[in-house]
């Protein structure tokens, strides 16, 4: 079986899915103590890198996704599927798991 090479630019989410690059979590506390990976909070902030075409409605039309590529978003803590590509962390979310846009 041939190996599949996946590049971030080739990821095309389906339906109402949104592909988000995770913002790095804090490496140390306010007091300067370095945190091990096991003590870090799971990130909830990221930048949208790809969006799907939207959820299909009963009449066959699609509901547009409210976020666009480049938007910063806040998402549910345990939502989505974590993906690592090229040493970077990403998460594939349903649009409903996005809580807010961040200016």
Curated annotation (Swiss-Prot):
Gene Ontology molecular function: any one: unfolded protein binding
Localisation: Cytoplasm
Keyword set, alphabetical order: Chaperone, Cytoplasm
Keyword Transit peptide: no
Pfam families attached to this UniProt entry: Cpn10
Domain of life: Bacteria
Gene Ontology annotations for the cellular component aspect, listed alphabetically: cytoplasm
One GO biological process term: chaperone cofactor-dependent protein refolding
Gene3D superfamilies associated with the record: GroES chaperonin (2.30.33.40)
Subunit details: Heptamer of 7 subunits arranged in a ring. Interacts with the chaperonin GroEL.
General function of this protein: Together with the chaperonin GroEL, plays an essential role in assisting protein folding. The GroEL-GroES system forms a nano-cage that allows encapsulation of the non-native substrate proteins and provides a physical environment optimized to promote and accelerate protein folding. GroES binds to the apical surface of the GroEL ring, thereby capping the opening of the GroEL channel.
HAMAP family: CH10 (MF_00580)
Family the UniProt entry places it in: Belongs to the GroES chaperonin family.
Protein name: Co-chaperonin GroES
Name of the gene this protein is made from: groES
